[in-house]
């Protein structure tokens, strides 16, 4: 059993704004990996998107970066990867992870996804091909109900359909490897599994969404304003209010 030299774990997102659930997700994965692999370097990064084709962008890249920096200022194991921000949108996770695979060929890559994201992989650019580049670490969201027991079968079906659609255009792709997504039951099972594996965590992500924070932070209802404030790192909340981010048009 060969230990990886380094494990690189990243959580991507628009982070508009970053909130406490984001931080709890990446912190949980980092600490689980530290327990599973105490003698391996674990590098955890937040990967802000340049602009999602599936979302509008209320703030600038610089403002999002400043909020991220404030949010992780006292989190020593966490840093920001600006790879996607250095590219012109649209930028796709498939291309970013392809670059990471070339940049770090000997490292174990893990891409963290919430349940809401993994259930929309069919809408992502070459979404199901991400498994050919990385392992996925999936975290459930309580508001969405239980993850399907047939997730492996569903992924397998989609991967087969995707392979049939692309095989003529990419004859050199390793179809066999790409069509064997395998759900593992422990982070330790990631040893020697550099791609194609999915770990479905039992850690329940707090039910916080950036879109709700944007809608509630200036709400006329005190309860919603308080919920928005309590969902954010205090420094990020102050930054948003100071710069009047997400303020409704007058």
Segments the model singles out, each with a brief description of its role:
Residues 1-250:
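Nucleotidyltransferase catalytic core that binds NTPs
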């Amino acid at each position: 059993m060969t230990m990886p030299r380094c494990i690189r774990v990243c959580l991507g997102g628009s982070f508009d704004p970053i909130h406490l659930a984001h931080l709890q997700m990446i912190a949980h994965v980092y600490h689980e990996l530290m327990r599973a692999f105490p003698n391996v370097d674990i590098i955890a990064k937040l990967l802000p998107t340049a602009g999602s084709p599936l979302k509008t962008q209320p703030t600038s890249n610089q403002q999002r970066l400043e909020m991220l920096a404030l949010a992780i200022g006292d989190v020593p194991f966490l840093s920001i990867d600006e790879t996607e921000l250095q590219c012109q949108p649209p930028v796709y996770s498939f291309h970013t992870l392809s670059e990471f695979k070339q940049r770090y060929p000997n490292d174990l890559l893990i891409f963290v996804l919430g349940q809401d994201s993994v259930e929309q992989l069919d809408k992502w650019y070459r979404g199901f091909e991400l498994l050919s580049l990385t392992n996925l670490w999936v975290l459930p969201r309580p508001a969405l109900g239980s993850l399907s027991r047939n997730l492996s079968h569903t992924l397998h079906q989609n991967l087969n359909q995707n392979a049939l659609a692309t095989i003529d255009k990419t004859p050199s792709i390793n179809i066999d490897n790409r069509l064997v997504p395998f759900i593992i039951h422990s982070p330790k099972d990631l040893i020697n599994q550099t791609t194609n594996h999915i770990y479905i965590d039992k850690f329940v992500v707090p039910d916080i969404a950036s879109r709700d924070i944007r809608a509630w932070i200036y709400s006329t209802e005190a309860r919603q304003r308080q919920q928005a404030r309590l969902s954010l790192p205090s420094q990020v909340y102050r930054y948003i209010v100071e710069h009047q981010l997400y303020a409704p048009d007058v």
